[in-house]
């Protein structure tokens, strides 16, 4: 077990690793990288007890099992909150260390998930292509709230979701606002409501809607502020399981926070190319997001806001 291993070159601030039961290893790691202060807690259950555990500080471990042990089944629970929650998650999802039982449940869950769109006709290859693409639409976002509802917020405090609601992260919004998010309004409205409530929680903890959130932080990656188009699309389609007044407030405030040349955009209707990179792309995407705000404000009867943002949306003509 090696807590020093990283996929990217993140800075590791803190590691903890300990034996917590005859067949359990648990710990945590805090890193600085694409997002700051990323916490991962884990609890790993093994189907066989350890014969020996050599801990190399708080960072690595060498596990030894009895000579007759040939097969191990391991269940690893994860949490952004605590080892206790990680263990709770693992026991809730994998109560028994039975690989075949877990596999059967996973097959059933994937069949249900992929069954929200049913197609008929076409060749086997075309069906394979379609359902492979459908599978890819299910890989994100990531569920961040634990089975008890707790999750780590962007301000690093721990909160709890109300019963029946879930907190999500990993919103690659610049990549998804055009197609993936509108698709979800057709096939999974419960997820759409959970995502928007999660966005509003991020707004509460940071003062701004997310741009590209990951785990318990914001990467600030890519351009635009496309959370507003996701919210407006849902609202205009009648998906409204969140505080719409608060959502509109968050959209307006986020549109006026300076990022990647948006101060020039707000002041003069475009971003000069000799001052900021990606000036045309940023101008076009800010104008689109302003149009989304205008449409939602209009639907809510906020004509004052509609007029201002309909005017801002016309900035696309400047490039």
Task: Indicate where each model-derived feature is located.
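Beta-sandwich/jelly-roll carbohydrate-recognition scaffolds of carbohydrate-active enzymes
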Residues: 1-168
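Surface-exposed patches in mature extracellular/periplasmic domains of secreted proteins
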Residues: 119-122, 147, 195, 303-310
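Short alpha-helical scaffolding segments that buttress acidic/His motifs in well-ordered protein cores
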Residues: 130-137, 199, 251, 313
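Aromatic-rich carbohydrate-recognition surfaces in CAZymes
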Residues: 169-297, 310
């Amino acid at each position: 077990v090696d807590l020093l291993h990283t996929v990217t070159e993140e800075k590791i601030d803190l590691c903890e690793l300990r034996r917590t039961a005859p067949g359990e290893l648990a710990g945590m790691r805090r890193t600085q990288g694409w997002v700051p202060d990323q916490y991962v807690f884990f609890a790993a259950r093994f189907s066989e007890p350890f014969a020996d555990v050599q801990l190399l500080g708080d960072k690595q471990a060498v596990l030894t099992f009895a000579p007759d042990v040939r097969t191990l089944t391991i269940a690893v629970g994860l949490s952004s909150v605590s080892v206790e929650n990680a263990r709770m998650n693992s026991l809730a999802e994998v109560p028994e260390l039975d690989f075949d039982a877990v596999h059967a449940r996973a097959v059933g869950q994937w069949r249900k998930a992929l069954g929200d769109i049913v197609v008929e006709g076409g060749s086997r290859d075309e069906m394979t292509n379609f359902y492979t693409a459908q599978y890819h639409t299910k890989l994100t976002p990531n569920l961040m709230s634990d089975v008890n509802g707790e999750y780590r917020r962007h301000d690093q405090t721990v909160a709890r979701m109300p019963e029946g609601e879930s907190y999500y992260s990993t919103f690659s919004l610049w990549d998804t606002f055009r197609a993936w998010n509108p698709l979800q309004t057709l096939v999974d409205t419960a997820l759409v409501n959970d995502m928007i409530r999660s966005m509003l929680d991020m707004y509460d903890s940071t003062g701004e809607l997310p741009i590209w959130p990951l785990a318990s932080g914001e990467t600030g990656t890519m351009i635009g502020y496309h959370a507003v188009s996701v919210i407006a699309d849902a609202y205009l389609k009648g998906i409204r399981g969140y505080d719409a007044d608060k959502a509109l407030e968050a959209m307006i405030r986020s549109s006026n926070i300076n990022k990647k040349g948006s101060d020039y955009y707000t002041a003069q209707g475009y971003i000069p190319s000799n001052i900021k990179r990606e000036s045309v792309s940023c101008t076009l995407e800010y104008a689109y997001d302003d149009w989304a705000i205008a449409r939602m404000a209009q639907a809510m009867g906020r004509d004052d806001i509609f007029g201002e943002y309909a005017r801002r949306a016309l900035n696309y003509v400047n490039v």
